[in-house]
Amino acid sequence: MGVTQVGVNTSFNLVKKIILLVVFSLTLVLLFFYKNHNNKSHIQIGGDFELTNHLGQKTTNDSFNGYHRLVFFGFTNCPDFCPNTLNNIGIVINQIDKKDQLVPIFITVDPERDTVAKLKKYLTNFHPKIIGLTGTNEQIKSVKTKYKIFSKKVMDTKKENGKSNNHNDGRDHGCYGVDHTTIIYLMDKKGVYITHFSPDTNNTDMVKKINQYL
């Protein structure tokens, strides 16, 4: 009888240990997935910057506090994609419900050519709410890093009679274009990343998505 009781106790203890081990393992798995999900929901895009707007005023991330932002990187010598995107952003601004709560921001990836004066002149072609930002090479490099933006100069080797054949105006600092990331970011009122739009997102979908957050 005593032997049987010992056997029962041993089996019970074994089952208890197995249950505790399973519970512990499940806890670790749940913690892993929670941490993973938490990291994904707080994507580190954006942050502090110090640049100059197209009116010559010092501008930081805090300058836009209280407003959602649409942030797009490009350059004024861009032949078609940048102007098309800026035109589309203007259309979106006109169609959203609370347009006074959203600021569209255009940050250059070509600070050598995109001076304050050039940005100001360029932006007269687009929606008046769009704010252009430029800065030194180091300032632009810093803000590109924070927004996960890639850009690279592409030299124009096709020339006729000493003039560039590409669509970029290379008169200022040589003949080159700039390959760059073409994502449009939607940031919240504190400059925290919400979502982004790819180049092929149509205006209707953008308006619908933006209205969800304003």
Predicted feature residues:
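A short beta-strand-turn-helix
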Residues: E50-R69, I93
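N-terminal targeting signals for export/organelle localization
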Residues: M1-T52, Y213
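Structural microenvironment flanking redox-active thiols in thiol-disulfide oxidoreductases
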Residues: L86-T145
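Thiol-/selenol-based redox modules, centered on thioredoxin-like
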Residues: K158-L214
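Short active-site neighborhood of thiol/selenol oxidoreductases, capturing the structured segment around
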Residues: N61-T85, I89
